[in-house]
């Protein structure tokens, strides 16, 4: 069913429709209890498949977002089932772009924003993923359209509709001890969006933090290059080793750059475990970020050390991998 403007669900009045997904429909709403403010209301609308199991998964998503607390995650304030419509719902943060509409990374045209913004979004999305992984949650659907951009220009990770909960205590708290396993096993289907699937998921293996890292890599590869990622060899030994070697590889590549716009190096995300995949993605983002700031000239020895742009400290190696930051030699 579709709610109309003015309809009331869970103490909220519908203002407008924001969007429809596989599990539910999202509306902008305002409180009717005098609390003020506007929120997003997600209502379960699935009417096919194992509806009862999917309903429980929907509620598990809401409960999980109530428990998880991170500045780059959606926050759920209330969840329940409305007697009038007979459907479960949850009320969450309303995340709108600067223009008042819903904006995701899928709305960003490659090349339309500077790489500093992209590096910022990458850091925020990665931080959110590392947090949920530590809590025993695997997102399983990291992609451009599931990373929102708020009015402040920050990235917010959303849509936990097919998340996998690996922590035993969390599964019990969410009341998903057996239900979700049954849903996921249905027809041995692969959970997630095809273009973002890690090789192990295509083989039918379970999702892990490493597969989320792969999906994040594909997401930002697409955002940076405008093309879909295709596995390939590591270029010029890039990321062959941790530590200073990857900085040296960057310098070699940057020294040969004919202009301020450098193609993203070809990297093989499929052959790296979780920790290495984060590094691969970070280097790709860092390369373009450095170029945008003009740092490529400094790293290639074409700019005096004193002229190094301050921006390198704002979104560069320090944030990606503090332990692997190499200071320039005097």
Tell what function each PLM region has.
Residues 79:
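Activation-segment/catalytic-loop signature of the eukaryotic protein kinase fold
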Residues 126-137:
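Protein kinase catalytic-loop region centered on the HRD/HxD motif
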Residues 25:
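Conserved N-lobe ATP-binding subsite of Hanks-type protein kinase domains
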Residues 45-67:
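AlphaC helix of the eukaryotic protein kinase fold
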Residues 85-100:
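Conserved short submotifs of the Hanks-type protein kinase catalytic core
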Residues 121-122:
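Activation segment signature within eukaryotic-like protein kinase domains
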């Amino acid at each position: 069913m579709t709610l109309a403007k003015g309809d009331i669900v869970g103490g909220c009045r519908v203002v407008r429709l924001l969007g429809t997904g596989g599990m539910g429909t999202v509306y902008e709403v305002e409180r009717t209890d005098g609390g003020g403010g506007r929120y997003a209301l997600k209502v379960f609308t699935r009417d096919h498949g194992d509806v009862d199991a999917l309903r429980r998964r929907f509620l598990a998503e809401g409960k999980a977002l109530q428990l998880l607390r991170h500045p780059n995650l959606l926050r759920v304030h209330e969840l329940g089932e409305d007697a009038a419509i007979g459907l479960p719902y949850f009320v969450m943060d309303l995340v709108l772009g600067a223009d008042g509409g819903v904006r995701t990374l899928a709305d960003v045209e490659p090349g339309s924003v500077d790489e500093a913004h992209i590096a910022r979004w990458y850091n925020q999305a990665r931080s959110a993923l590392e947090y949920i992984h530590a809590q025993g949650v695997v997102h399983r659907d990291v992609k451009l359209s599931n990373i929102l951009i708020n009015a402040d220009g920050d990235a917010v990770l959303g849509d936990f509709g097919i998340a996998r909960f690996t922590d035993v205590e969390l599964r019990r708290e969410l009341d998903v001890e057996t239900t979700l396993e049954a849903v996921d096993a249905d027809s041995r289907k692969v959970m997630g969006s095809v273009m973002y699937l890690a090789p192990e998921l295509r083989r039918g293996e379970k999702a892990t933090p490493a597969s989320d890292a792969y999906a994040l890599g594909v997401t930002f590869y697409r955002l940076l290059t405008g093309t879909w990622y295709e596995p390939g060899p590591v270029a010029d030994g890039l990321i062959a080793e941790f530590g200073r070697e990857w900085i040296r590889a960057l310098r070699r590549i940057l020294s040969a750059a004919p202009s301020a716009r450098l193609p993203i190096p070809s990297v093989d995300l499929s052959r790296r475990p979780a920790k290495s995949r984060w590094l691969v993605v970070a280097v790709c983002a860092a390369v373009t970020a450095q170029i945008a700031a003009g740092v490529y000239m400094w790293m290639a020895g074409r700019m005096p050390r004193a002229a190094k742009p301050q921006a390198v400290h704002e979104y560069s190696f320090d944030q990606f991998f503090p332990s692997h930051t190499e200071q320039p030699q005097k």
